[in-house]
C-alpha cells in the first residue's frame, strides 16, 4: 500500500511538472501566438552609399554599398514581402556624400529608397550644427520621396522652452515639426503591430559638441515612452532604435543598462559604438542587436511571439555585403547622380573631381579600422597629421607660429 502511494505521488508530480512546462519557458516555441516578425537592421552607415575598399583578414576587399544592400533586402523580401527595416542612426558623415548633406539629404533619402521604415539620429547628424540638421530634414521632406520616420524620445523641449529657445534650437524644432519627428511611431507589418521609439545616448551627446539641444536622461525618458505606448497603443512588439551602444564593460554598456531598466522593450537596434554582435545580447526578454558600421553587413532577425506576448528569436544573421553580391542597377544609378552633384556643387570649387587620384605611393598604410582598434601611433595617422600641418603652414593666414597636432 505504501509503495502504491509513492508511485501515485510520483506520477502526479510528473503530471504537474509537464503541465507547467509552457509557464517555465520550456518548449516555448510550441506555445506561441502564431505571429512572426522579420526585422532587417543597419546603423552607423556614415554616408557610405558607395562600396569601399578595406582590408579583411589581411586582404584588400570591396565591401558595403547601398546598391548591394538593396539586392540583399530584395532577396529577404522574397522570403517575407513585408519585413520591418530599422536603422540606428549616424547615417551621415564619413564620405564625400556628406558635402551635400544639407542640400540633398542624400543619406536619409537613400535609406528611404532602400525601404527603411524608421531611423533615429546619431551624434554625427549634428556635425553641421543646428542649421545643418534643420536644413537636411527640410530638404528630405521637400523631396516628396518616401523617407523613413524619425524618432527620438528624450529631447527636453520643456527645459529649452522654459529657458527660451536659441535660434538654433528653434530651427531644429521647426524642422522637427515639418518633417514629423516623434517620440515613437506605430508600424503595421502583416498581422503584427510594432511601436518603435528612439533614444539618444549619453555618450552620443558627449560626442556631439555642436549640439545645442538639451536631453532628458535616456532611461527615464524611455520608461515614460514605453508606459505611454502600453497605455495608448495596442501593439504586439516594442522596439527601440538607440544611438547609445554597447561596450565590453556591462556596467557601462548603455543599451544593456537600458534593457535591464526598461524590460518591456522587446528589441533594441543598438548604434553608436560600431559594434558587431554575432549573436544578440539578451537581458530578460529583451534582445540587443548590432551589425557593425558603414553598411558592411545587413542585420536580420526573425522572431516568433510567445503566448505571454513576448518574443523568441528563431534566427539571427549578419549578412556580409561583399563584392560577390550583384549591385542593384537602379540604386547605383541614383548614387551616381548624387556623386555628380558632389562634383558640381563641391569639388569643382577646388579643381577636383570625385574619381581623381591625388597621390600614389608604395607604402602599405594602416587601415581606418586599425586606428579605431589600436590607439597608438600609426602611419596613416602620421600622414594625416602631416597634411594638416602642411595645410596650415601654407595657408594665407599662417602667422609663423609652430604648428603641432596633438
Where are these regions (language model features)?
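Bacterial N-terminal signal peptides that target proteins for export
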Residues: 1-11
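Hydrophobic core
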Residues: 12, 16-20
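Sec-dependent signal peptide cleavage junction
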Residues: 20-33
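Acidic, metal/ion-coordinating pockets
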Residues: 31-324
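Solvent-exposed loop/linker segments at secondary-structure transitions
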Residues: 46-50, 92-99, 111-114, 230, ...
Amino acid at each position: 500500500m505504501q509503495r502504491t502511494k509513492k508511485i501515485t505521488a510520483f506520477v502526479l508530480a510528473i503530471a504537474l511538472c509537464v503541465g507547467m512546462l509552457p509557464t517555465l519557458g520550456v518548449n516555448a516555441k510550441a506555445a506561441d501566438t502564431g505571429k512572426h516578425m522579420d526585422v532587417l537592421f543597419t546603423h552607423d552607415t556614415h554616408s557610405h552609399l558607395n562600396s569601399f575598399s578595406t582590408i579583411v583578414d589581411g586582404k584588400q576587399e570591396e565591401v558595403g554599398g547601398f546598391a548591394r544592400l538593396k539586392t540583399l533586402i530584395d532577396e529577404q523580401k522574397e522570403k517575407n514581402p513585408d519585413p520591418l527595416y530599422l536603422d540606428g542612426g549616424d547615417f551621415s558623415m564619413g564620405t564625400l556624400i556628406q558635402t551635400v548633406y544639407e542640400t540633398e539629404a542624400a543619406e536619409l533619402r537613400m535609406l528611404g529608397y532602400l525601404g527603411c521604415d524608421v531611423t533615429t539620429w546619431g551624434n554625427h547628424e549634428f556635425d553641421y550644427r543646428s542649421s545643418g540638421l534643420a536644413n537636411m530634414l527640410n530638404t528630405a521632406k521637400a523631396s516628396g520621396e518616401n523617407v523613413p520616420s524619425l524618432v527620438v524620445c528624450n529631447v527636453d523641449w520643456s527645459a529649452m522652452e522654459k529657458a527660451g529657445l536659441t535660434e538654433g534650437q528653434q530651427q531644429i524644432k521647426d524642422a522637427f515639426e515639418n518633417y514629423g519627428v516623434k517620440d515613437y511611431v506605430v508600424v503595421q507589418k502583416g498581422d503584427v503591430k510594432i511601436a518603435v521609439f528612439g533614444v539618444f545616448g549619453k555618450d552620443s551627446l558627449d560626442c556631439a559638441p555642436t549640439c545645442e539641444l538639451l536631453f532628458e536622461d535616456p532611461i527615464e525618458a524611455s520608461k515614460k515612452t514605453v508606459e505611454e505606448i502600453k497605455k495608448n497603443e495596442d501593439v504586439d512588439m516594442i522596439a527601440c532604435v538607440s544611438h547609445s551602444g554597447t561596450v565590453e564593460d556591462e556596467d557601462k554598456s548603455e543599451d544593456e543598462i537600458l534593457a535591464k531598466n526598461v524590460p518591456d522593450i522587446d528589441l533594441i537596434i543598438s548604434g553608436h559604438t560600431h559594434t558587431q554582435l554575432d549573436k544578440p545580447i539578451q537581458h530578460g526578454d529583451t534582445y540587443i542587436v548590432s551589425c557593425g558600421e558603414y553598411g558592411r553587413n545587413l542585420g536580420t532577425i526573425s522572431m516568433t511571439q510567445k503566448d505571454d506576448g513576448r518574443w523568441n528569436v528563431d534566427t539571427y544573421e549578419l549578412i556580409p555585403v561583399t563584392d560577390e553580391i550583384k549591385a542593384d542597377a537602379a540604386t547605383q544609378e541614383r548614387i551616381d547622380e548624387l556623386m555628380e552633384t558632389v562634383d558640381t556643387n563641391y569639388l569643382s570649387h577646388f579643381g577636383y573631381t570625385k574619381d581623381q587620384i591625388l597621390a600614389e605611393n608604395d607604402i602599405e598604410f594602416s587601415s581606418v579600422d586599425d586606428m579605431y582598434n589600436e590607439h597608438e601611433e600609426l602611419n596613416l595617422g602620421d600622414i594625416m597629421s602631416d597634411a594638416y600641418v602642411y595645410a596650415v603652414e601654407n595657408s594665407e593666414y599662417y602667422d609663423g607660429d609652430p604648428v603641432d597636432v596633438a
